[in-house]
From Swiss-Prot:
GO terms for biological process: translation. The gene is rpsI. Keywords: Ribonucleoprotein, Ribosomal protein. This is Small ribosomal subunit protein uS9. InterPro entries: Ribosomal_Su5_D2-typ_SF (IPR020568), Ribosomal_uS9 (IPR000754), Ribosomal_uS9_bac/plastid (IPR023035), Ribosomal_uS9_CS (IPR020574), Ribsml_uS5_D2-typ_fold_subgr (IPR014721). It comes from Renibacterium salmoninarum (strain ATCC 33209 / DSM 20767 / JCM 11484 / NBRC 15589 / NCIMB 2235). HAMAP family: Ribosomal_uS9_B.
Length: 167
């Protein structure tokens, strides 16, 4: 770099340090939003496929009760446990709330998806200002509208046709 062209009396090292110190100082000066005290409860309903989850989130220690059982007992599959915990992880609220849920209908994947939506909606209800943008960006507040397509008359399944013989 030709420092004489920029400023003849300023050395190259001074130019580099001045730029780096300015950018780091401005990042530190940005005020960080303080999270409010975790004293509010939230309740919401989540749906996915045929499953319906009624969820209540209360300040606590991170205990999960699903249909009267622990989360690991109700969802033995680790993928379902991770899916349900995602809203807390993305908001850095692991262990800050207890979750009580009643789930009916559907299978394990649908129930896990319904529970995740219910938890995300509850966390959104608790603190809309801080949580909504993050949850929305991650797609946790969007209801997955995909359901099983119905069987049609004359077909074996929704789209599978019986074998066709030309002659």
């Amino acid at each position: 770099m030709n420092t004489e062209a920029v400023a003849p009396d300023v050395a190259e090292e001074e130019v580099l340090t001045s730029y780096t110190s300015e950018s780091s100082a401005s990042a530190d000066d940005a005020p960080k939003k303080e999270r409010p005290a975790l004293t509010v409860s939230g309740a919401a309903v989540g749906r996915r496929k045929e499953a319906i989850a009624r969820v209540r989130v209360t300040p606590g220690t991170g205990k999960w009760i699903v249909n009267g059982r622990e989360l690991a007992d109700y969802f033995p599959n680790k993928l379902h446990q991770q899916e349900v915990n995602e809203p807390f992880k993305i908001l850095d609220l692991d262990g800050a709330y207890d979750v009580a849920a009643r789930i009916s209908g559907g299978g394990p994947s649908g129930q896990a998806g319904a529970l995740r939506l219910g938890v995300a909606r509850s966390l959104n209800e608790i603190d809309v200002d801080n949580n909504r943008a993050t949850l929305k960006k991650a797609g946790f507040l969007t209801r997955d509208a995909r359901v099983i397509e119905r069987k049609k008359a004359g077909l074996k399944k929704a789209r599978k046709a019986p074998q066709y013989s030309k002659r």
